[in-house]
Amino acid sequence: MPKSPHKLFKANSFWKENNLILREIKHFRKIAILAVIFSFLAASFEGVSIGFLLSFLQKLTSPNDPIQTGISWVDMILAADAWPIPPIYRISLLILLSTWMRATFNYFGGVYTESAQLNLADRLHKQIFEQLQALRLSYFAQTRSGELINTITTEIERIKQGFSGLAFVLTRIMTVCVYFVVMFSISWQLSIISVLIFLLLAVGLSTLNKRVRETSFGISHANAQFTAVAVEFINGIRTIQAFGTQEFERQRFYKASTNQLNAAIKVVLAWTLVKPIAEGIATTVLISLIVISFATFTLPVASLLTFFFVLVRVIPNIQDINGTVAFLSTLQGSSENIKNILQTNNKPYLKNGKLHFQGLKRSIDLVSVDFGYTADNLVLNNITLTIERGKTTALVGASGAGKTTLADLIPRFYDPTEGQILVDGLDVQYFEINSLRRKMAVVSQDTFIFNTSIRDNIAYGTSGASEAEIREVARLANALQFIEEMPEGFDTKLGDRGVRLSGGQRQRIAIARALLRDPEILILDEATSALDSVSERLIQESIEKLSVGRTVIAIAHRLSTIAKADKVVVMEQGRIVEQGNYQELLEQRGKLWKYHQMQHESGQTNS
C-alpha cells in the first residue's frame, strides 16, 4: 500500500534532520504562516521588479523603441498606449512602488521570522526545564551539569539559528520559484535544462552535506565537554586554590578549549567547501547554457538577455540555499542533544501519586527495602524500620553506611529498588509528591544558598512569611547576630552558592529556612556538623525545641547530637545492625558502644 503524503513527508530526510524545528512550528503556526506569506510576497515583488528594471534600462538606451523584455505580461503592462504618462516615468514609478512593497514585505517577513525563532527557543527552554524537573535525582547523578547547561544555552541558541536558516532557505526557494516562472515564460526549453542541472547540483552537494552533518556531532560533544570543565572550574575555584592545582586545571581547560577549536575547524572546513563548489558549478552551468542557447535556440536578443539576466539572479540564490543547507547540517549534533534530553522512553521518572498528603498520623515504615543507584550495586540491603510520629529517629554509622540514602527515600528523592515505604499503612508512591514534600524540611550537609538576599534565602519555599517570622527563625538558628552585622542586614546579597558566608553561616541560614517551613517531618543530615562548638550547642537547643511534636530523622557522625533521640539506628554497609534506645544500646556494648568509645577517645562526646 502506498504511503500517505503525510507519512512520505515524515520519511523524507529533510524532515528527519529538521523535525525538532518543524514539529514545534505547530505551536506558533500563525506567526510562521504570516512569515511565509510576507516572505512569498517579498519574493514575488522581487521578480516583478526585475521585469520593470529591464524595461527601465531598455528605455534609457532605446527610448523610441517598443519595450521587449521577453516577458509578455510586463510588455503588455508597459505598452505605450496603456498609460497617459511617458514610459520612462511610469516605469520609474513602478520600480519605486515594487521596491518599497518588497521592502515592506521583507520587513514584516523578518519580524515574524524572528518572532517565530524566539518562540521556538522559549518553548525548548521550557520543555527542557519541565523535563529536568520531572526526573529523578539519579539522572543528575549520572549527568554532568556542564553538559546540561550547554544544551540549555548553546545548543538551543544554535537551533534558533537553524530556524532562521530554514526561514532563509524557504524565502530563497520562493524567490527562485518566481525567477523560474519568469524564465519559463521566456523559454521553457532553456528553463527545463537549467532546472535539471540545478537538481543534479543539489544531489551532488548532498554528499558534502552528509559529511558536514557527521562533523556536527563532534562540535556538540566538544562544546558540552568544554562547558562542563568551565562550570567545574568556577564552582571548584576555592578547592583549586586551596590545593594549588591551578596548573592541572589550566591544562584541563586548555585541552577542552583546544578540542572545541579542532572540532569547530572540522565543521568549518566541511561547511565552507559547499558554497565555492556550488558557485563554480553554477558558473559553469551559466556559461554552458549561453553556449547551448546560441547554438541551438533562436530567441530574440531581448528575450535571451532577459533570460540570462534572471538566471544570473538565480545563481546567487542557489548558492545561498546550498550554503545554508550545509549550515543546517552543522546543527544536527545540537538537535540530537536536545532530542536526547526531551526523550521520555529512556529517563528515570518519579511516579506521582494522586492522594493529597494531609500529614503523618502514625508512622513511616520501611519494609524490606533495597536500594541501589545502579541495578548491580545495592547501597541499602533489607532495611526494615519504623519511624514513629512525633519522635526523633537518629541514624548513626560511618561514612558510606547508607544513612543519607535512607533519609533520601522518605521525601522520595529516590524510590526503593525492592520493598516498600509505607506512610500510615499506604505506599508513599500513592501520595502526590509536592503535597508530601510540603510537610517536610531537609537540612543537609550540602547546603545550597541562592544568589539573592538573606531574607529571600530564609523565606525560600514559604510564601507570605512576615518580617517578624523571618527574624524569629534567624534568632532560633543562631543566625540573627551575624546577619545584623552584614552590610545590608537581611537585604545583603550572598553571591553564588553563598560565597560571602562561612560554612557555619550557610548551615544556619539553611536551618532558619527549615524552621520557617514549620514542617511536620524534619530531616537533619549532619545539620550541625559545620558549626563551631558554641553554635552547635545553641543550634542543638533550638532543634530540640523544634522537634517537640514533630517527626525528626537526624543523621550524624557525632554521638552528642543524637544522645536524646527516641530511637537510634546503627548502620553498616547499607544494613541496620542495631536499633533501640541510646542508653540501652550502649549497655549492650555492641556497635554503638564501639562508636561511642572511639569518639570519646577523640574528645567528640560531651560526657
Curated annotation (Swiss-Prot):
ATP binds at residues 397-404. Induction: By deprivation of nitrate. Pfam families: ABC_membrane (PF00664), ABC_tran (PF00005). Residues 364-598 form the ABC transporter domain. Residues 32-330 form the ABC transmembrane type-1 domain. It comes from the Bacteria. The keyword Protein transport does not apply. One of its GO terms (molecular function) is ATPase-coupled lipid transmembrane transporter activity. GO terms for cellular component: plasma membrane. It is a multi-pass membrane protein. Its main location: membrane. The keyword Kinase does not apply. Belongs to the ABC transporter superfamily. This is Heterocyst differentiation ATP-binding protein HepA. It comes from Nostoc sp. (strain PCC 7120 / SAG 25.82 / UTEX 2576). The lineage of its organism: Bacteria, Bacillati, Cyanobacteriota, Cyanophyceae, Nostocales.
